[in-house]
A protein has these predicted regions:
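A structural signal for multi-pass alpha-helical bundles of membrane permease subunits
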Residues: 1-199
Length: 199
């Protein structure tokens, strides 16, 4: 039980402290059609090997799942910190009243950490278009270009490769404005529905 806990914590927290280059290298190694562990498992269960990074249909799934894995550690630390602020007397009183563990989680833990959840949601919505070009460029190849060419990579190529600095700056500014508008809208909705907001 202790080993499983440490193993889970390691694979959850470690990606948050590893560079994007290393994460991308691990993803490429895990998903390799010939030597990747994922395709070895597919072959073991009698399924056909999949070229995840060569097939445009799989690129978005790979990018999102690797991003979730990479960000889980940071989110876990934030939520654990929020849970540590839950009043233990509430749990003790609920236990005396006969509340089950699930009921204590639902009626004590979740309502207590709702403000933290709302703040994280607002911050994530504010950066919803900021995909980050580093990992996409590292995972990108000519075969998955139709799925992997996003605003961030477009700005990078136009600005640094094509030397169209003004155009790249305009596109980047447009992306920032959209993010700011979304942030303001979600913050206003949060302030109207509850007492939690960024400002």
């Amino acid at each position: 039980d202790g080993f499983f806990k440490k193993f889970t914590q390691t694979i959850t927290y470690a990606p948050n402290f590893i560079s994007v280059v290393v994460i991308s290298g691990m993803v490429i190694a895990f998903l390799s059609p010939s030597t990747g562990i994922i395709n070895h498992l597919l072959s073991f269960f009698g399924m056909e090997r999949i070229s995840f990074l060569e097939d445009p249909r799989w690129f978005k799934t790979v990018y999102v799942l690797s991003g979730v894995w990479q960000g889980t550690g940071w989110g876990s630390v934030i939520y654990l910190a929020a849970l540590s602020g839950v009043d233990t007397q509430l749990h003790e009183a609920a236990t005396i009243d006969g509340a089950t563990r699930l009921q204590r989680m639902w009626y004590i833990n979740i309502p207590t950490i709702v403000p933290t959840m709302v703040i994280l949601l607002i911050m994530n919505v504010g950066s919803i278009m900021a995909t980050g070009y580093e990992k996409i460029l590292l995972l990108q190849n000519p075969l998955n270009m139709e799925s992997s060419n996003v605003i961030a990579t477009f700005v990078y190529k136009q600005g640094l490769l094509e030397a169209q600095y003004s155009f790249a700056a305009a596109v980047g500014l447009f992306e920032s404005v959209i993010n700011a508008i979304l942030l303001i809208i979600v913050n206003k909705i949060s302030r109207k529905l509850g007492d939690t907001s960024l400002w």
